[in-house]
Amino acid sequence: MSIENLARTNVRDLTPYQSARRLGGNGDVWLNANEYPIAPEFQLTAQTFNRYPECQPALVIERYAEYAGVKKEQVLVSRGADEGIELLIRAFCEPGKDAILFCPPTYGMYAVSAETFGVERRTVAAKQDWQLDLPAIADSLDNVKLIYVCSPNNPTGNLIDANDLRSLLEMAKGKAIVAVDEAYIEFCPQASVAGWLNDYPHLAILRTLSKAFALAGLRCGFTLGNEDLIALLLKVIAPYPLSTPVADIAAQALSTEGIRIMRQRVTEIAANRSWLLQALQNCACVEQVFTSDSNYLLARFTASSNVFKTLWDQGIILRDQNKQPGLSGCLRITIGTREECQRVVDALSALPGATKTRQEPM
């Protein structure tokens, strides 16, 4: 008998999330995972590796609460924001009965996490401008316990309209948790909904140190919510989600100096993003570049498969978005160093058709 026959049916049928590392590649310019291109330096200060860590490391919680402008009781730390996505499903959704709802094109882990736990995945496609289709969502809320909204949205890069988010929260009152994924909020901090927590007890906010804090390898994320919501998540989280070294480095990253350095990175990435956006608009193989409030750009190409493979063969690894609804011909490009951005532009400019006659980026 195959061991697979012992597995749960939904797990046998599951297609795992195709992360950048799972997809692989042999490049030296990695622009496919929205990581910061340069590794930060930290020194471990904690040496108590013989002891179990705190369930919720006090210094990490304290510093993140201060940074986010919320109370300590409104913060939960986890192994990346991905664990936060799962914790919400485990805490609020009955398998085989309840559903989650999300609006593609968007981050793929919402669907994978729900499928893993036997929870229905319900989708309402975003409108042509990638904003929420509120009437369609209102018609789809039967048995929905969780609504995931990514803002800025991955992979499109746009912010979700704040008035629409408020309308969604009003619509979901007494029915569902609204989880706003703010993994990229450091690139547009004015758009955070963290200040809304006291108004909406059914609001959860997902955060991470993987992007602007340049700590994707650390696997440290946060869920913000009111005390009752956090208390429920604490019931289902593993007893020691963060190892001692992870908590040590996270606390350093959230120090006054760590936050200053993070904001310096954001300024640098924003400048490179503006440069790359203009440069891509000069490339004949590019049909459209979409504006972004994050650390990546989405672009539609005339022959995206050829572009993807040509750059792949040169060691420049991008993220193919062709399978996402409404994103035919689209590739997502992480904003790297200026030199990495130049490598992308040089490779694209060498493709047949050369470049458009337009002003060069400064």
From Swiss-Prot:
Enzyme nomenclature, EC number: 2.6.1.9
Keywords: Amino-acid biosynthesis, Aminotransferase, Histidine biosynthesis, Pyridoxal phosphate, Transferase
Functional pathway: Amino-acid biosynthesis; L-histidine biosynthesis; L-histidine from 5-phospho-alpha-D-ribose 1-diphosphate: step 7/9
PROSITE patterns: AA_TRANSFER_CLASS_2 (PS00599)
Cofactors: pyridoxal 5'-phosphate
Catalytic activity reported: L-histidinol phosphate + 2-oxoglutarate = 3-(imidazol-4-yl)-2-oxopropyl phosphate + L-glutamate
Residues that bear N6-(pyridoxal phosphate)lysine: 211
Domain of life: Bacteria
InterPro entries, sorted: Aminotrans_II_pyridoxalP_BS, Aminotransferase_I/II_large, HisP_aminotrans, PyrdxlP-dep_Trfase, PyrdxlP-dep_Trfase_major, PyrdxlP-dep_Trfase_small
Disulfide bonds: none
GO molecular function, one term: histidinol-phosphate transaminase activity
Pfam families on file: Aminotran_1_2
Top-tier EC class: transferase
GO biological process: L-histidine biosynthetic process
Self-association state and partner proteins as the record states: Homodimer.
Record family assignment: Belongs to the class-II pyridoxal-phosphate-dependent aminotransferase family. Histidinol-phosphate aminotransferase subfamily.
The name this protein goes by in its record: Histidinol-phosphate aminotransferase
Gene that produces this protein: hisC
